[in-house]
């Protein structure tokens, strides 16, 4: 079993695995995968070299393509455009269902999901039996590879549509269970664990204060400091919570949690990452579930109180949802129905006795949370998911940190193939649970088709290959209905958390780094240790991530050249594919490259749009106004009509009646009103608590934003291409500087 130790020096937040001493680094799953790839490669080479047996096999496949099953082919009609009727009917049915059920119900979800699943099977049957171009080895290899990549890209979606039939909501159950907790009839002891490794003190302080504000008496709060900082120990003492540490950092976060579990005694255990702040009703809404002895763990969503770097860099903070939203709003409920909820490592509550049965948290992977949940399921415990935003944390603050975080998640998940907690083989799981976990594992393999699709128009144009044999009637009758329905209902099915077009931007940004990580994991699954995502950082300059941009720049140039060639040779075979696909790739790659420009982040604190009444006191005068933004650092205020403010003032927030001293750092007159920035000064611990509770702990404050539909998403992409993003960002930075 690997052990993990902290790296000394400049590697902030890095745990490095010790060498295991194995003589054979390639493990059995890796050898099986390489053998399968070698077998497929040998067939392809044999076909290219003209091997008679292999050639005969593909001649027969070509005969199947030339004489496809009639049920897959379009009917013969006097006008091909009559073949649009099925697409129009499906589109209208989808619109009617979405109009009748703006929020998907179990029945409507199953109806639409079942229809999509049928069209999925029909489409891939047609692709397999009717559209392959295997007339010669070169076209054939390209055509079959494209089909395989399409299937790999969409198989996860097919699994999701199948699992939709088991989707579950526990809100009503939470309403019932919370009654006993609020009335004091069920109040088990709760230990709240906050593991920390190098996070700034002000972030951990915010989390501690949020945990102390929870509406629950029988709780103990523990800071688990894996860097043994004197300042963190003093912070815990100052705020009145427990401080735990250990002599080494073996097994990273999992080891930290396991060490704490052996020193604490609460019946239930809550884990919050150092940057996650709960709302005051977190325990009221979750503890009651454990009255049922079968419940081993309850997960709640990971929400974020700042925008992810992709949305921020594109200037779409108020439009895009965090990438994780589709997982917590759509995938976790269907996983809950299948009994395969994913433990996300934070914002969850578990039964101590259940953790003891599995020897606490799993230590042989960097995704200790995921595999701990699998072991609990295998032991017969039920993992539940409550789809309510009861906490919020800090999203990665730069595009580089965002990608590194995804690479860690992917690396940890794919380590499933190499450890005993493999959800596909571990005893105790049923077929539905294994299917749901297979969907999660397959997700990380979609980087291969995503990257391959970027090369398709380039290969098609330069090599003059035609990977898809199709006609206009087939396109209208088979391809169009499937994609039109999927585009129409995708965001509705996932509860408006993600659109296909905008989601593809996220996929392109991370596809190439994830692909290299997947290959590394398959060759050396434990070659890299746990890397903590840096949090609480500020920067005063633009930063373009050239390491991520370089491969995309090359792809953009090659795609542009292939597009121009296709434009002049449009009538030729294969060129129409290069033209249409190339145009799409040009748009998405260009927008993806825009996301790599990190904006300056001048404050360590988040400023929230919040309008409420405020009074300023100074020079024996009262100045009434309204807040525009509030943070732990200060407040932006509008006073209408404009007045002359003294430099030092007292700020009274209404209706909280929170009074804090402050200093006016910026002010300007706009349309007869005074806009002023007031920085708080000499904030006491109690005042800071009130600010944290106001900004982070109010139940229901973390909104569920709805993503634009596909048509709106397409318009957003084109607007991004047309507007001068760098100048927009410069303007935003100037506005930001007014606050600091």
Task: Kindly give the residue locations of the regions a language model identified.
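N-terminal membrane-anchoring/stem segments of glycan-assembly enzymes
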Residues: 2-184, 236, 447-450, 571-598, ...
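Short, acidic, metal-binding catalytic loop of nucleotide-sugar glycosyltransferases
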Residues: 209-218
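Cell-envelope/extracellular polymer assembly enzymes that use nucleotide-activated donors
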Residues: 189-191, 220, 371
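Long helical/loop segments within the catalytic core of UDP-sugar-dependent glycosyltransferases
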Residues: 245-268, 280-366, 377-378, 399-445
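Membrane-embedded multi-pass helical conduit in multi-pass membrane proteins
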Residues: 50-57, 95-149, 443-528, 543-604, ...
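A conserved acidic beta->alpha catalytic loop
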Residues: 225-232, 248-249
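Structured alpha-helical
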Residues: 539-740
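The conserved acidic donor/metal-binding loop of glycosyltransferases
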Residues: 273-277
């Amino acid at each position: 079993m690997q052990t993990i130790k902290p790296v000394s020096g400049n590697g902030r937040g890095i745990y490095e695995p010790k060498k295991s001493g194995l003589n054979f680094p390639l493990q059995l799953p890796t050898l099986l995968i390489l053998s399968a790839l070698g077998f497929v490669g040998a067939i392809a080479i044999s076909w290219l070299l003209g091997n008679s047996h292999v050639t005969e096999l593909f001649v027969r496949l070509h005969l199947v393509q030339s004489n496809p099953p009639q049920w897959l082919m379009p009917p013969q009609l006097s006008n091909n455009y009559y073949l649009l009727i099925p697409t129009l009917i499906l589109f209208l049915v989808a619109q009617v269902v979405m109009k009748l059920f703006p929020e998907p119900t179990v029945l409507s979800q199953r109806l639409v999901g079942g229809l999509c699943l049928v069209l999925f099977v029909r489409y891939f049957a047609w692709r397999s039996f009717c559209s392959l171009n295997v007339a010669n080895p070169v076209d054939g290899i390209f055509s079959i590879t494209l089909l395989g990549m399409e299937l790999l890209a969409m198989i996860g979606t097919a699994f999701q549509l199948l699992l939709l039939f088991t989707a579950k909501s526990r809100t009503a159950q939470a309403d019932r269970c919370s009654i006993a907790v609020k009335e004091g009839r069920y109040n088990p002891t709760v230990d709240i664990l906050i593991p920390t490794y190098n996070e700034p003190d002000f972030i951990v302080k915010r989390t501690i204060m949020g945990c102390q504000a929870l509406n629950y008496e029988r709780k103990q709060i523990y800071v688990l400091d894996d860097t043994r900082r004197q300042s963190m120990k003093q912070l815990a003492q100052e705020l009145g919570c427990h401080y735990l540490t250990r002599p080494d950092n073996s097994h990273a976060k999992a080891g930290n949690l396991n060490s704490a579990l052996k020193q604490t005694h609460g019946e239930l255990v809550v884990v919050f990452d150092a940057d996650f702040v709960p709302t005051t009703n977190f325990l009221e809404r979750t503890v009651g579930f454990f009255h049922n002895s079968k419940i081993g763990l309850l997960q709640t969503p990971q929400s974020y109180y700042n925008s992810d770097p992709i949305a921020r860099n594109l200037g779409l903070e108020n439009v895009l949802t965090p990438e994780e939203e589709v997982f917590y709003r759509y995938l976790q409920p269907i996983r809950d129905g299948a009994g395969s909820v994913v433990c996300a490592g934070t914002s969850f509550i578990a039964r101590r006795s259940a953790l003891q049965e599995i020897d606490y948290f799993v230590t042989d992977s960097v995704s200790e949370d995921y595999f701990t949940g699998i072991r609990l399921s295998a032991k017969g415990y039920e993992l539940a998911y409550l789809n309510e935003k009861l906490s919020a944390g800090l999203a990665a603050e730069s595009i580089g940190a965002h990608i590194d975080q995804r690479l860690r998640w992917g690396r940890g998940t794919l380590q499933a193939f190499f450890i005993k907690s493999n959800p596909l083989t571990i005893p105790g799981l049923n077929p539905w649970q294994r299917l749901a976990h297979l969907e999660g594992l397959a997700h990380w393999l979609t980087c291969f088709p995503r990257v391959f699709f970027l090369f398709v128009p380039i290969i098609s144009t330069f090599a003059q290959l035609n990977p898809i044999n199709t006609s206009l009637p087939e396109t209208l009758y088979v391809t169009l209905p499937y994609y039109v329905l999927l585009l129409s209902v995708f965001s509705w099915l996932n509860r408006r958390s993600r659109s296909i077009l905008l989601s593809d931007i996220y996929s392109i940004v991370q596809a190439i780094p994830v692909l290299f990580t997947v290959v590394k994991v398959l060759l050396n699954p434990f070659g890299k240790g746990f890397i903590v995502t840096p949090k609480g950082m500020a920067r005063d300059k633009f930063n373009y991530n050239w390491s991520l941009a370089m491969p995309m720049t090359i792809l953009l140039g090659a795609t542009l050249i292939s597009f121009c060639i296709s434009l002049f040779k449009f009538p030729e075979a294969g060129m129409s594919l290069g033209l249409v696909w190339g145009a799409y790739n040009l748009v998405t790659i260009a927008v993806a490259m825009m996301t790599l420009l990190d904006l300056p982040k001048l404050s360590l604190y988040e400023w929230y749009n919040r309008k409420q009444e405020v009074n300023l006191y100074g020079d024996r005068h009262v100045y009434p106004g309204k807040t525009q933004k509030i943070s732990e650092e200060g407040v932006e205020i509008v006073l209408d009509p404009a007045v002359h403010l003294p430099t030092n003032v007292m700020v009274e927030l209404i209706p909280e009646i929170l009074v804090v001293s402050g200093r006016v750092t910026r002010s300007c007159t706009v349309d007869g009103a005074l806009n002023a920035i007031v920085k708080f000064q000499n904030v006491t611990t109690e005042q800071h608590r009130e600010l944290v509770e106001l900004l982070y702990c109010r139940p229901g404050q973390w909104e569920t934003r709805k993503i634009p539909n596909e048509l709106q998403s397409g318009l957003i992409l084109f607007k991004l291409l047309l507007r001068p993003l760098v100048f927009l960002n410069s303007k935003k930075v100037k506005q930001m500087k007014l606050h600091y």
